[in-house]
């Protein structure tokens, strides 16, 4: 197993040609928020990653292995809930309210100009629909905010220029619609009952203990 214990945020200082040639490794958020984990890169090499505690790995970062080789991290698509405001019965300000309430619950949130993303949670989904918001399930990379005082991070809490997903979140599974269907009978669920019964636990056998 090849050991990697150095991280270059967004490949800082590396020539673009080196980044293109580097092997890649796809990691979801559950793994990337850990400082120690195992993974397999695009060439089939087994990696043991040992970073300083508190380090958060973002898509576009580069891991440097003990032999000097580099591995570029790709934020893997994963199950997320995409939250948008209801144009018929709400306003864009509803997203601000949603972010406030989710933040009070210490929920990891990815903030985008026109929507929010969180990890699947049927209780939170019901709460958000009750606030006139549209909640749809999809597969997409997840890059939540790191927090203004996040320790050990490397400044990804607010710049996020690296969302080169290349698919504009085209992986929506059509579990919801973009129009609010309720008749304003005060149930305010926008007609989206997404109780699919999934167990949203994510087992990642590659993760090592912190």
Curated annotation (Swiss-Prot):
Residue span of region Disordered: 144-210
This protein's record includes keyword Cytoplasm: yes
Bias-annotated ranges (Basic and acidic residues): 156-202
Keywords: Chaperone, Cytoplasm, Nickel, Nickel insertion
Record GO terms (molecular function): nickel cation binding; unfolded protein binding
GO cellular component, one term: cytoplasm
Domain of life: Bacteria
Gene3D superfamilies linked to this entry: Urease metallochaperone UreE, N-terminal domain (2.60.260.20), UreE, C-terminal domain (3.30.70.790)
SMART domains per the UniProt record, alphabetical: UreE_N
Pfam families: UreE_C, UreE_N
GO BP terms: protein folding; protein-containing complex assembly; urea metabolic process
Predominant place of localization: cytoplasm
Presence of the UniProt keyword RNA-binding in the record: no
Location relative to the cell: Cytoplasm
Family, as annotated: Belongs to the UreE family.
Known function: Involved in urease metallocenter assembly. Binds nickel. Probably functions as a nickel donor during metallocenter assembly.
Stated name of the protein: Urease accessory protein UreE
Organism: Paracidovorax citrulli (strain AAC00-1)
Gene field: ureE
């Amino acid at each position: 197993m090849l050991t990697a214990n150095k991280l270059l945020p967004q490949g800082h200082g590396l020539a673009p040609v080196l980044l293109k040639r580097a092997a890649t490794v796809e990691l979801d958020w559950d793994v990337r928020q850990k400082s120690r984990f195992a993974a397999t890169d695009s060439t089939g090499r087994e990696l043991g990653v040992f970073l300083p505690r508190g380090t958060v790995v973002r898509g576009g970062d580069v891991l440097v292995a003990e032999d000097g080789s580099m591995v570029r991290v790709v934020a893997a698509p994963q199950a997320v809930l995409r939250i948008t405001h209801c144009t018929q019965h709400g306003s864009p300000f509803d997203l601000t309210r949603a972010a406030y309430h989710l933040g009070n619950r210490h929920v990891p949130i990815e903030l985008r100009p026109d929507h929010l993303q969180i990890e699947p949670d049927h209780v939170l989904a019901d709460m958000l629909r009750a606030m006139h918001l549209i909640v749809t399930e999809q597969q997409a990379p997840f890059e939540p905010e790191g927090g203004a005082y996040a320790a050990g991070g490397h400044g990804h809490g607010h710049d996020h220029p690296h969302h080169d997903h290349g698919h504009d979140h085209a992986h929506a599974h059509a579990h919801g619609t973009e129009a609010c269907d309720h008749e304003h009978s005060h149930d305010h669920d926008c007609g989206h009952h997404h109780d699919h019964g999934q167990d949203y636990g994510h087992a990642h056998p590659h993760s090592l203990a912190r």
